[in-house]
């Protein structure tokens, strides 16, 4: 394992303290953490499954795998066999350990976007591999690479890759025998452009060989506190992950698996949450642009990627003086040093407070 970086949210604590001193209180737009209530149908399913004296199946209950496969088909137009679905104890742990679980190690390369969720870099470090930030995997050419991370819609900038872009990357990865993984945790939150799954037949030609897609229930279902996600795709890769996870004890608790079934079977709560986020996004974007920020990309996901042409840390401090906490773009790579990432996951009241302070 290579040395790990400092945990980014620890670095932000002094700015959080500064923002919290505002007379009207803190508006936390940094983390992107769900704040709306977990839907009753999910909580009821969890409560009904709390008599769980035995160990849960690492591969997931049949009901969970079938619900996930049905959700993929219904919402994303993707066909997978339920056996090619694997639950995760939240997708962050899966992302962090996936290269290592697939046998990646010293001398191997793990590629990820130049602007990226920090855990992609951590996944290379935990495997002892070399992390390679790229604007596009295609720039690697014939350079050997073991695992390639995509993130569409992306965090932090909210970019959505098109079908032709994804198709070209799939062909490139297959030519080199690289495992290609798309973190699709924001796929149900496309705004200006419709996100498409890596497993869509228009992208992969109907074959999932060498491909995996990772889906989080934290954002779509307000389940961050439950730690729940799924991975699907190439059955052989899913099988390899399952074997490691069985040995490591990476099983989702049985009550959480029951709640996941309820979440994946119900679309109504997702549409309600989309409406909430669409409203908050609109209010916040208008206020930011009125305050001189330029919002770039942000076509999908739960963040606005914004700049006023100044370094990110002074921008973070100025916003903290207004009682608004945001994430510095430098957390996501050198290419983000002129940007801040602003989440619209706070309550309507806190979003309104932020908008008022920006005007």
Curated annotation (Swiss-Prot):
GO BP, sorted A to Z: antibiotic biosynthetic process
**Which co-factors does it depend on?**
pyridoxal 5'-phosphate
* InterPro entries per record: Aminotransferase_I/II_large, LL-DAP_aminotransferase, OxyQ, PyrdxlP-dep_Trfase, PyrdxlP-dep_Trfase_major, PyrdxlP-dep_Trfase_small
Residues reported to bind pyridoxal 5'-phosphate: 91-92, 155, 186, 216-218, 227
Taken from the record, one Pfam family name reads Aminotran_1_2
- Its EC top class is transferase
- EC assignment: the record states 2.6.1.-
Keywords for this entry? Answer: Aminotransferase, Antibiotic biosynthesis, Pyridoxal phosphate, Transferase
Q: Which GO terms describe its molecular function?
A: pyridoxal phosphate binding; transaminase activity
What's this protein's function? Answer: Involved in the biosynthesis of the tetracycline antibiotic, oxytetracycline. Catalyzes the conversion of 4-dedimethylamino-4-oxoanhydrotetracycline to yield 4-amino-4-de(dimethylamino)anhydrotetracycline (4-amino-ATC).
- In which family does this protein belong, per the annotation? Belongs to the class-I pyridoxal-phosphate-dependent aminotransferase family.
**NCBIfam families per UniProt:** DapC_actino
Give the protein's recorded name. Answer: 4-dedimethylamino-4-oxo-anhydrotetracycline transaminase OxyQ
Species annotation: Streptomyces rimosus
């Amino acid at each position: 394992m290579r040395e790990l970086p400092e945990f980014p949210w620890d670095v932000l604590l002094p700015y959080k303290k500064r923002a919290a001193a505002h007379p009207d209180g803190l508006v936390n737009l940094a983390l992107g953490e769900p704040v709306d209530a977990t839907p009753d149908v999910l909580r009821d399913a969890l409560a009904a499954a709390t008599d769980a004296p035995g160990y849960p199946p690492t591969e997931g209950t049949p009901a969970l795998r079938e619900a996930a496969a049905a959700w993929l088909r219904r919402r994303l137009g993707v066909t997978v066999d339920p056996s090619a679905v694997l639950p995760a104890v939240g997708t962050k742990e899966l992302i962090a350990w996936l290269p290592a679980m697939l046998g990646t190690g010293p001398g191997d390369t793990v590629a990820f976007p130049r602007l990226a969720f920090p855990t992609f870099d951590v996944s290379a470090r935990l495997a002892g591999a070399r992390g390679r930030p790229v604007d596009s995997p295609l720039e690697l050419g014939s350079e050997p690479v073991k695992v390639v991370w995509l993130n569409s819609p992306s965090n932090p900038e909210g970019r959505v890759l098109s079908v032709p872009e994804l198709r070209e990357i799939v062909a490139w990865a297959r030519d080199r025998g690289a495992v290609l993984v798309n973190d699709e945790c924001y796929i149900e939150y496309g705004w200006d452009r419709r996100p498409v799954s890596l497993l869509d037949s228009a992208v992969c030609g109907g074959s999932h060989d060498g491909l995996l897609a990772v889906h989080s229930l934290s954002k779509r279902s307000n389940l961050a506190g439950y730690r729940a996600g799924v991975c699907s795709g190439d059955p052989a890769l899913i099988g390899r992950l399952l074997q490691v996870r069985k040995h490591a004890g990476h099983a989702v608790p049985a009550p959480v698996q029951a709640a996941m079934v309820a979440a994946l079977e119900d679309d109504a709560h997702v549409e309600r949450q989309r409406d909430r986020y669409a409203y908050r996004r609109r209010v916040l974007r208008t206020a930011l642009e009125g305050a001189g920020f330029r919002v770039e990309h942000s076509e999908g996901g739960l963040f606005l990627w914004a700049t006023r042409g100044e370094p990110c840390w002074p921008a973070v401090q100025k916003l903290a003086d207004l009682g608004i906490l945001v994430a510095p773009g430098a957390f996501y790579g050198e290419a983000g040093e002129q940007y801040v990432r602003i989440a619209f996951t706070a309550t309507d009241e806190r979003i309104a407070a932020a908008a008022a302070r920006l005007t």
